[in-house]
């Protein structure tokens, strides 16, 4: 993967210098598992590492200026992003101006500009960027989730530091959960990772996952991709939607059975609340479409001012499924509308929104599928 050796060299040096490293993740299932993989992996090789997962409402997606300022206050030397960062050029430049080292691990689409009929990547000024979607990255699988990119990074670091390769096996189940939960194509390498992860998930050593399986009455079930996508995964996602993703990270990092059981119960209850709110929002969106001129639009844009912003993407997905048209759901923000979109195979939301970037949004993040 492009920049892998450079990224390994950087952290090898930083660890030898006992520099403070901060992982900045994301609040969804891919971001939480990515953060956990990097946190555990870097701690294993002796890094002085901590983590920060942005709050969906208070912070928004990705790395923002106030997170750079906080890192400066905390005397952080090196920032490692996961499942975000590729579109944060201004924020990365801010970190660089403050003397920090920045390593991006991400899997989202690379921003670009059109020049003479060709797309030119617009990359942030990070010290190393691990993202297989970079045009000049030779890594063959362009459809990795963020957790697998993080896993690849830890694998390379383990090799450099002489950590036994068998220790990587503990991350397979996390890679599988993120791959299914972030809706990656289950082909080739992804399929192999998911198969291996599912085999290990039933007998996982992770106390948090053990208790989450128990809280959802799956102790005796043959756990499949369905259970990740529709039972366990939504519980991990629920905290980032309705509470704080730190709760899901705490579940994965739980040290006792009692702590794990409590957190698993909390997440399962949150997911039940999420289901009820999603159904209510979906019904309202359908009512609006069916009773207005929206039903004639090729791209459906529905405004639900009272909908929790974290549910916009799920509801947009349900609308897309019902009408087989690209769908956006916008919710009320303090100074602007916030929302999420889900598309169909023949329509690239990313490309269409890039065309009207100057007027349509302040930050763009879309699913990679």
Task: Kindly label every feature range from the protein language model.
Residues 1-78, 98-99, 116-119, 125, ...:
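Hydrophobic helix-and-loop "lid/oligomerization" segment in the mid-to-C-terminal part
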Residues 52, 82, 105-107, 130-132, ...:
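Generic beta-sheet signal
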Residues 79-82, 137-141, 183:
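Flexible, glycine/proline-enriched loop segments at strand-loop-helix junctions
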Residues 86-87:
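Phosphate/diphosphate-binding loops
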Residues 92-111, 183:
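Catalytic PLP-binding core of fold-type I/II PLP enzymes
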Residues 103-105, 109-164, 172:
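Conserved phosphate-handling catalytic cores of large alpha/beta enzymes
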Residues 150, 365-368:
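Intrinsically disordered, low-complexity repeat segments enriched in small/polar residues
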């Amino acid at each position: 993967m492009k920049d892998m050796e450079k990224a390994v060299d950087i952290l090898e040096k930083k660890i030898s210098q006992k520099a403070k490293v901060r992982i900045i993740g994301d609040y969804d299932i891919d971001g939480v598992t990515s953060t956990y993989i990097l946190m555990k992996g870097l701690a294993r090789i002796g890094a002085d590492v901590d983590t920060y997962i942005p709050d969906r409402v208070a912070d928004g997606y990705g790395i923002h200026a106030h997170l750079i300022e906080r890192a400066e206050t905390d005397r952080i030397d090196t920032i490692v992003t996961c499942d975000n960062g590729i579109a944060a050029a201004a924020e990365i430049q801010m970190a660089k101006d403050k003397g920090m080292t920045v390593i991006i691990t991400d899997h989202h689409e690379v921003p670009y500009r059109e020049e003479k009929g060709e797309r030119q990547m617009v990359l942030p000024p990070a010290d190393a960027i691990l993202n297989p979607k970079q045009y000049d990255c030779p890594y063959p699988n362009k459809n990795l989730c963020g957790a697998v990119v993080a896993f690849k990074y830890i694998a390379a670091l383990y090799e450099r530091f002489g950590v036994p390769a068998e220790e990587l096996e503990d991350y397979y189940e996390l890679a599988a959960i993120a791959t299914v939960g972030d809706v990656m194509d289950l082909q080739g390498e992804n399929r192999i990772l998911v198969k291996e992860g599912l085999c290990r998930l039933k007998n996982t050593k992770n106390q948090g996952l053990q208790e989450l399986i128990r809280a959802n009455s799956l102790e005796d079930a043959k756990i499949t991709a369905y259970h990740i996508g529709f039972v366990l995964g939504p519980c991990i996602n629920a905290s980032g939607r309705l509470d704080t993703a730190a709760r899901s990270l705490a579940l994965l990092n739980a040290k006792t059975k009692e702590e794990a059981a409590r957190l698993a119960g909390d997440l399962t209850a949150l997911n039940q609340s999420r289901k009820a709110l999603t159904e209510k929002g979906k019904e309202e969106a359908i009512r609006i479409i069916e009773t207005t001129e929206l039903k004639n639009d090729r791209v459906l844009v529905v405004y639900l001012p009272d909908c929790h912003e974290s549910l916009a993407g799920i509801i947009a997905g349900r609308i897309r499924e019902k009408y087989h048209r690209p769908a956006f759901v916008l919710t009320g923000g303090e100074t602007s509308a916030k929302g999420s979109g889900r598309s169909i195979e023949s329509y690239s939301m990313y490309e269409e929104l890039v065309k009207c970037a100057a007027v349509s949004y302040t930050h763009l993040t879309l699913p990679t599928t």
